[in-house]
Amino acid sequence: PFTDFGFKKLFGSEPNKDLLADFLNELLPDKHKIHTLSYSKSEYLGPSLSDRKAIFDIFCTNEQGDKFIVEIQRAKQIYFKDRSIYYSTFPIQEQAIKGIWDFRLTAVYTIAILDFVFENDNNDQHVVVKVQLKDQDNQVFYEKLTYIYLQMPFFNKTAEELETNFEKWLFVLKNIEKLTEIPSRLKNKIFMKFFGEAEIANLAQEERAAYEQSLKVYRDLKNVTDTAFIEGYGVAKQEAHNKLVNAIKKAISLGNSIQETAEIFEISESEVEKYLNQ
């Protein structure tokens, strides 16, 4: 599922709304649980044509009007947290009503499945990182804006160790490509459907080709970014710059557009063009 095609096939298609709802409900408080959901457009433009746009992997709404951005992030980005905050402003802004409006908002959730981990000074290895706006006394100031990040490299349970439905979801998301058979603890209605949808042999030929291409881009791009992003500990500035330039050129060579490459590296399109000419 750590490919665009695989992720959207399993969670972003109309017949699989029950899979997405079951997964999201493991992360949500009771008052925001999803009973029914609808998919919304995944591309949003800024207020003017010159503004950046946001392209979500999956964007959906529940019956109460709560908004959910669901994304899969394969490679570490320098300004990933900034990007995450920026993207969450779009479903907030779209709630504005012309004319008289009391500014009441519905909840907005950003849920990101990460194929990497955040830098952490205290060595905590939390699979789930939940972020909300808090005051100086560490009390939640605003409860309708929530960011939930799943650091998949920290989840290492085996099939025999799975206890909760949430752990089962984490397990299949991380291990589905490695499994040769369905573990007994995952043989329920939801997960049997998930495995059925994920079975490559059941995909149409065109879908399978799209999957293989998506998988190739993921593996190549992950290899590039794993070596390109510099953590900043004693690495010469020029060396870091050279690796960034090479990574950008590699991303373009893999078929990404200038706009897509700018999204990947969290830089402007003009900066991408500048690096390509170096």
Spans of features found by a protein language model:
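Elongated, amphipathic alpha-helical interaction scaffolds
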Residues: 1-278
